[in-house]
């Protein structure tokens, strides 16, 4: 997958040179480029923003450098142009899965009070990280790109690495434990030490269902319980 990020602060994306994403870039599974929007302004002082028409607080990013940056990147990257903004669709795991199927994507990070409305003509999709305000689109772009990239084939060692994680199948993840088996008098659940894979699988599913219902009832209501899920919960409750 190729991703181009249009931003005023390309240095912020050096985080992708590390950990799992960094290794995937080294293996050429991923290619993440940053493009400095300021390089495309025609203003002699390298300005990319100006005061809003009609008055108001703050500054607005001008259309010209944004549009010229998009046009240049589009010569090599034919992917969707995604703007990180508050009016967009709220990002979630299902959207991450959909975007992970794409071969190319372009992300546009806004700043200041937003972007000139005329730049929207070159944008295919707007995504929001949630109902809160951030200093710039970069803060939203980094977790969104990370979430998408880790679902790309070959980035993680196996699909099991993300299929059991929170949100992937509509549930929160089950509790995890590592050595030692007893810490401060608290033991790892016996089933996890049993080596019985089927019982471990059922315990994890039951825990995911119970935790989701308790912590995120909104998610649990959307989740469609199967007959197997109901049986797993019934058997689990019998053992309590």
From Swiss-Prot:
InterPro entries: Alpha/beta_knot_MTases, tRNA_m1G_MeTrfase_C_sf, tRNA_m1G_MeTrfase_TrmD, tRNA_m1G_MTases_N, tRNA_MeTrfase_TRMD/TRM10
Molecular-function annotations in GO: tRNA (guanine(37)-N1)-methyltransferase activity
The UniProt record lists the keyword S-adenosyl-L-methionine: yes
Pfam families: tRNA_m1G_MT (PF01746)
CDD domains in the record: TrmD-like (cd18080)
Keywords associated with the record: Cytoplasm, Methyltransferase, S-adenosyl-L-methionine, Transferase, tRNA processing
Domain of life (superkingdom): Bacteria
GO cellular component: cytosol
Location of the protein in the cell: Cytoplasm
Function (record text): Specifically methylates guanosine-37 in various tRNAs.
Entry-linked HAMAP family: TrmD (MF_00605)
UniProt similarity note: Belongs to the RNA methyltransferase TrmD family.
Name the record gives this protein: tRNA (guanine-N(1)-)-methyltransferase
Organism this protein belongs to: Clostridium botulinum (strain Kyoto / Type A2)
């Amino acid at each position: 997958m190729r991703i181009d990020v249009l931003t005023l602060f390309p240095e912020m994306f050096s985080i992708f040179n590390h950990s799992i994403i960094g290794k995937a870039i080294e293996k050429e599974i991923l290619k993440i480029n940053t493009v400095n929007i300021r390089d495309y302004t025609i203003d002699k002082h390298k300005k990319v923003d100006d005061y809003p028409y009609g008055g108001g607080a703050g500054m607005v990013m001008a259309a010209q450098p944004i549009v010229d940056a998009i046009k240049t990147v589009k010569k090599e990257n034919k992917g969707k142009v995604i703007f990180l903004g508050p009016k967009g669709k709220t990002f979630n795991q299902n959207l991450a899965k959909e975007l992970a199927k794409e071969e190319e994507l372009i992300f546009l990070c806004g700043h200041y009070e937003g972007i000139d409305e005329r730049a929207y003509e070159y944008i295919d999709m707007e995504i929001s990280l949630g109902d809160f305000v951030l200093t710039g689109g970069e803060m939203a772009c980094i977790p969104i790109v990370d979430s998408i990239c880790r679902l790309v084939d070959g980035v993680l060692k196996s699909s099991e690495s993300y299929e059991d994680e929170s949100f992937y199948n509509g549930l929160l993840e089950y509790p995890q434990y590592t050595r030692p088996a007893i810490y401060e008098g608290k033991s790892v659940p016996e089933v996890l030490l049993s080596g019985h894979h089927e019982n471990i699988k059922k315990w994890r599913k039951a825990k995911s269902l119970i935790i989701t219902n308790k912590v995120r009832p909104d998610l649990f209501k959307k989740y469609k319980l199967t007959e197997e899920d109901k049986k797993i919960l019934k058997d689990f409750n019998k053992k309590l």
